[in-house]
Amino acid sequence: MSLGSRTFRSKRQMAAFEKSLQGRYLKLLRRNPFLFYGVPFCTLMAVGSYCLSDFTAVKYEREDKKVRSVQEDELVKLRANRRTVDLKEEFYRLQGLADQDWEPVRVPRLPGESENVWDVE
């Protein structure tokens, strides 16, 4: 028969152990396993989140720099390539009046190709 990781203590040694700091701590752990598992886990998550926030901040700062540099380049191009705006021209363009100069023309079919006409009676 094996005792495993537990050590054998006499009654006097056990009473002294229970009065010591280590004994009181182990007694609390047996009653409240949250102190042993929950508190360290929550602490680890909070500290880890705080430490990793620097890495995520660097990531977003890089993205901001890329966007800012692209915007500056595009701004220079836009200022250089501006076109003059005529109010009437824009009105007709938006109305689509210039696109109505067409006629529907049927595409000639190849020899032997069906006309795809549906006889609905």
UniProtKB/Swiss-Prot annotation:
It is found in: Mitochondrion inner membrane. Keywords: Membrane, Mitochondrion, Mitochondrion inner membrane, Transit peptide, Transmembrane, Transmembrane helix. Its main location: mitochondrion. Signal peptide: none annotated. The chain crosses the membrane at residues 34-56. Residues 1-31 form a transit peptide. The keyword Mitochondrion applies. Coiled coil: none annotated. One of its GO terms (biological process) is mitochondrial cytochrome c oxidase assembly. One of its GO terms (cellular component) is mitochondrial inner membrane. InterPro entries: Cyt_c_Oxase_assmbl_COX16. It is a single-pass membrane protein. Belongs to the COX16 family. Required for the assembly of the mitochondrial respiratory chain complex IV (CIV), also known as cytochrome c oxidase. May participate in merging the COX1 and COX2 assembly lines. This is Cytochrome c oxidase assembly protein COX16, mitochondrial. It comes from Eremothecium gossypii (strain ATCC 10895 / CBS 109.51 / FGSC 9923 / NRRL Y-1056) (Yeast).
